[in-house]
Amino acid sequence: MTGSLWLSLALSLAVLAQFKVSAAPNLVCFYDSQGSQRQGLAQFSMIDIELALQFCTHLVYGYAGVNADNYEMQSINKRLDLEQRHLAQITSMKERYPHIKFLLSVGGDADTNEGNQYIKLLESGQQGHRRFIESARDLVRRYNFDGLDLALQLPRNKPRKVHGDVGSAWKSFKKFFTGDFIVDTESETHKGQVTALIKDLSAALKQNDLLLSLTVLPNVNSSWYYDAPSIAPSLDFINLGTFDFLTPQRNPEEADFSAPTYEAVGQNRLGHYNLNFQMEHWLLQRVPANKINIGIATYGRSWKMSKDSGDSGMPVVPSTQGPAPAGPQSKQEGLLNWAEICSLMPNPSNSNARGPNAPVKRVVDPTKRYGSYAFRAADENGDHGLWISYDDPDSASSKAMYARARNLGGVALFDLTQDDFRGQCTNDRFPMLRAIKYRLL
């Protein structure tokens, strides 16, 4: 074959490879196995999983944990995972869905048995790392997973504080000199330990043709813990937790957009609280765009509005009183799943309702830059005030389009069990998942 023909063939293959990347983006579906333990309309069944799988490229089972004494990876719900064989149930679907990769995730803020076992793991040296790696590989192989997702529970950034203009200026001045924003004085050492762990873990998994992904949890400072250029070659993809920048638990006194795509300027906002900043950080660290998946949440964050919060609902909303009451399905203060949020929108069943069942006012973001919100001002007694920041199918679709436009790997959905998987709102099951998939096609 002549040199020109070889060149033409090489160029054609390169074009085809690029087309393949852009034509088949990732839709990484996180599945919180605790959803199968919920009651009533919130219970997520194997039938629900099967319906969702037609839209996913990867299914990530959450979650395993780390034993704080011996650093081995272990089940954190042995009754469900092992005795009821839920791990095996999930991977048994591989035969029917051979195009999907099934991963087991460790951490993910679900491992609450010990507060700092992940830092202890990093500091445990080669022996501790080896125990974790061997146990992780054994667990993944025993239950026939295709790989491991590493969702390390590392110290979080301190939340934004509420101050007046003068107070904010003084606080910034003070922080510059005292460094009181630092939450981990050993972060540089820990970064090196994370790098070593990921490289060794990847090498061990690759011996058995297993995948390794990294999930960066919300509000974990990537620059503190992840040496991106060093770890990227060892990772098949990276899921960014680009949501929960503000939550009622972290920011009880003010409500604001929890998952904006771009920076919402003004009002003492922090420039890194948005999807675009986080994604650009990894790109600037020379991580290939097609290894980055942006995270989209299927739930919203909800604050309790007080009389002093006003009645406009426009963020930043002052004088909030922490998390709003839990929803009837999600049963978690300060969090409402998409079905619960949708049911609060004006509809025939709540048009005359008052008090906690009164409808909310929906405010759509026409720019698609910040996200939608909904609110119900507090009544004359200061009760029943509610403010919700959320992504809906429209904004999720816009974020998926963002991922396509930036030639990213795709989207990671957190998670299937908080989507409207029963179609309670519009009779359309998994509306968030579907909206993302159709935009990624």
Curated annotation (Swiss-Prot):
One Pfam family recorded for the sequence: Glyco_hydro_18
Record-annotated GH18 domain positions: 25-441
Annotated region described as Disordered, given as residue ranges: 307-331
UniProtKB keywords: Developmental protein, Disulfide bond, Glycoprotein, Secreted, Signal
Record-level GO cellular component terms: extracellular region
UniProt-annotated glycosylation sites, renumbered to this chain: N221
Resulting phenotype, A14V: In strain: MB01a, MB13a, MB15b and MB46b
UniProt-listed SMART domains: Glyco_18 (SM00636)
Effect of R434C: In strain: MB37a
Main localization (coarse): secreted
GO MF, one example: imaginal disc growth factor receptor binding
Record PTM: Glycosylated.
UniProt keyword annotation of DNA repair present: no
Biological process, per Gene Ontology: carbohydrate metabolic process; chitin catabolic process; chitin-based cuticle development; ecdysis, chitin-based cuticle; imaginal disc development; regulation of chitin metabolic process; wound healing
Signal peptide start-end: 1-23
Effect seen on changing M46I: In strain: MB25a
Cysteines paired by S-S bonds: C29-C56, C342-C425
Note: Lacks the typical Glu active site in position 153 that is replaced by a Gln residue, preventing the hydrolase activity. Its precise function remains unclear.
Function: Cooperates with insulin-like peptides to stimulate the proliferation, polarization and motility of imaginal disk cells. May act by stabilizing the binding of insulin-like peptides to its receptor through a simultaneous interaction with both molecules to form a multiprotein signaling complex.
Name of the protein in its database record: Chitinase-like protein Idgf3
Species name: Drosophila melanogaster
Gene of this entry: Idgf3
